[in-house]
């Protein structure tokens, strides 16, 4: 069996695709091929997992009418031709789109070649690419029930977000490797300047018995490193965390954006969190994600307009100093966790491809 996956841009699109690819590779010994762009994190994350990847030229249109959109339109045309060539040569039994602009050309070309198609939408409110593709793909795997408001229900299957299986598998015995309270700070795979700026001030007078692992994002790392030297001994600064399963398991509290995959992994691991949703996203979907956890008593939410080093520190210490509240939030997060999404998407894909699964 051959499966082609299209995903690009940030880890939030790429990691779910990798989780799905592993299901097909492990259960069917399927031959896997990725399509991406050379500008996104797929150049690193996909190859790190040992999967082959081919690249096409594609970019997203600007919201305002600008001359640059003509260049992007030409790139899109070239991207469709490039994706079509890759698909004809690879001859997949199934094509799966997991988000990012690269999904459009790949899934569209597969449809034109009568190859079964499936897309996965990570957020409550689908992006433009998903809305367009949903008109002709065979199935749309969704992560939230509310997404049915935007896509024809006959096309959708509620699966949740595919997350790294190791997030769930880490046992309670493996979780605590530190004596003091531990905080994980992640601003997304590319980084979040506002979170980094706030943390740069916060760590200057943070209590010495609180251990902090702070992932700045690759494009922010060097700047943050220069601004915060010398760092307190209990603060570990890194550009990116590859073993996120271990990092989340080892934390008492996670400070993060509220992207769909981040939220899904926090819930699956059963961790209390302080969520700082990005306002710079379509339909403000991150705040929607964050508020869903807040309503269930699983997270504290701080919007950017409210964020200050003092407010974040007070919120954090309030949680760390109250173990009962921390444990309650952890239990509530765990209840919200949906696991088995990659397995379910694998089963849907097998049915679309007209094949029986090995399980």
Where are these regions (language model features)?
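Acidic donor-binding loop of glycosyltransferase active sites
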Residues: 92-94, 249-264, 271-272
